[in-house]
Amino acid sequence: MSEITGIARQKIHPGKLDEFKRLAAECMRVARIKDTGTVQYDFYFNADESECIVYERYRDSAALQEHLQNLGDLMGQVMAICTTTGEVLGEPSPELANG
């Protein structure tokens, strides 16, 4: 299995920056405690903090799937307050690619 890299661009909805930052911090806390195959998981804000780049690296597809399961409802809360686009780099498993 190969390493998987994710790059997400999140445009934060107006008035939701504080909530986004709170949720991002909680996502990072959960990832540090529960994830076993996460290599890197970082949030980078633009100058006016209207957008955030999330740079993620995982040991393999199974590690990314574990991360998504660990975040659970938190991910839904984040997605509700921003518009997200992104890329997955590497060779994700068929389950991850189709899931």
Q: Where are the language model's segments positioned?
A:
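Short beta-strand micro-motifs enriched in acidic
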Residues: Y44-D48
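Short, surface-exposed ligand-recognition loops at beta-strand->loop->(often short) alpha-helix junctions
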Residues: K11-K21
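Hydrophobic residues embedded in beta-strands of well-ordered beta-sheets
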Residues: S50-C52
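Active-site-flanking beta-strand signature of metal-NTP-handling nucleotidyl enzymes
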Residues: T5-Q10
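An amphipathic, aromatic/His-enriched active-site/gating alpha helix that lines ligand/cofactor pockets
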Residues: V30-V39, R57-G99
